């Protein structure tokens, strides 16, 4: 019965690709940058304004939407806000929409490319994971502890035993259904198909909540901003089937990261061994990753209490990354926290793990 219901969502035909292999996202970027590195799974974008300083790498989610979640529009760009807050060396992962040759890319593939990006920037880096970029960043910090100085987890699902809309949706669907979706796409999961299933259409009120501002349709600026959001929301990423099945099963169904059973690049990950400073940010009105789930990560870490920081922003899930007030408030405080002296010793900063 469950598979019959699932087949109504995914008709028996191969999905149309979201874009051609290698095609650059048509939505323009807001903040000036250069391409620092091109890897099989991503482009590493360099938003730096200086050659010196502590580097911050923002890890965008590789789930449904493109990396412009962190650079949507003027006044609604995390990258712009971090620059204004004094972060001089700044980078962003721009994950590629999956082409046929990427069908077997796994979580390990993305960790490997993230490691190359960090080595290119020069470790140790500060790492900020957005939504599902958070669990990837946490896995990376646990796998390569000496390469990450401080970690920011913003609206990030890790311990999915704490309920959320997203974890409930995954749990309600049989894993065979996800496998059918992958087979129908010849190993690629269509972003357009995912958009139909996972994303509820945004009302004007939803968009206003995400941007934390009123949008008067009579205003040309407001119409342009609404068009920008709509363009971003309707231009999803295709995902590698192997990666998609690992995420839905190992992370959201089996909860392996929180349980201590996840193996990353050949090594079992123990979150209690993560001892670096961590800042956790949650959205008060988040149904995707509610505060209880976002903050449940704290009890899994080995970080000393003085190095743990948590903050709740009165916004929706997307508001954490593009909301005008969140960017001017919580993210400015996060930038100050990254620049503050927490008393890490030189040995703790320089310890590199193979």
Annotate each PLM feature.
Residues 314-329:
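Catalytic histidine-centered segment of alpha/beta-hydrolase-like enzymes
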Residues 274, 280-282, 286:
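Short beta-strand/loop motif that positions the catalytic acidic residue
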């Amino acid at each position: 019965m469950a598979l019959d219901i699932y087949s109504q969502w995914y008709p028996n035909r191969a999905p149309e690709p979201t874009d051609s292999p290698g095609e650059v996202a048509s939505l323009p970027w807001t903040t000036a940058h250069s391409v620092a590195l091109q890897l099989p799974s991503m482009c590493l974008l360099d938003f730096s304004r200086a050659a010196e300083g502590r580097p911050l790498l923002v890890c965008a989610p590789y789930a449904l939407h493109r990396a412009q979640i962190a650079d949507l529009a003027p006044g609604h760009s995390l990258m712009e806000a971090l620059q204004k807050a004094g972060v001089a060396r700044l980078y962003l992962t721009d994950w590629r929409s999956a082409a046929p040759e990427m069908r077997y890319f796994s979580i390990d593939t993305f960790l490997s490319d993230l490691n190359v990006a960090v080595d290119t920037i020069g470790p140790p880096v500060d790492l900020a994971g957005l939504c599902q970029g958070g669990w990837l960043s946490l896995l990376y910090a646990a796998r390569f502890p000496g390469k990450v100085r401080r970690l920011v987890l913003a609206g990030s699902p890790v311990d999915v035993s704490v309920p959320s809309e997203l974890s409930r949706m995954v749990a309600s669907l049989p894993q065979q259904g996800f496998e059918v979706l992958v087979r129908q796409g010849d190993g690629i999961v269509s972003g357009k198909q995912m958009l139909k299933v996972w994303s509820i259409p945004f009302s004007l009120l939803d968009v206003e909540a995400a941007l934390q501002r009123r949008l008067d349709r009579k205003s040309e600026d407001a119409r342009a901003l609404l068009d920008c959001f709509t363009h971003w929301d309707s231009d999803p990423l295709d995902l590698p089937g192997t990666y998609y099945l690992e995420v839905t099963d190992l992370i959201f169904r089996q909860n392996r990261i929180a349980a201590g059973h996840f193996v990353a690049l050949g090594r079992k990950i123990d979150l209690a061994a993560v001892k670096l400073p961590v800042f956790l940010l949650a959205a008060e009105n988040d149904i995707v990753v509610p505060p209880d789930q976002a903050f449940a990560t704290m009890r899994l870490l080995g970080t000393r209490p003085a190095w743990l920081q948590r903050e709740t922003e009165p916004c929706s899930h997307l508001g954490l990354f593009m909301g005008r007030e969140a960017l001017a408030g919580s993210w400015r405080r996060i930038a100050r926290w990254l620049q503050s002296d927490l008393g890490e010793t030189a040995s703790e900063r320089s310890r590199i793990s193979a």
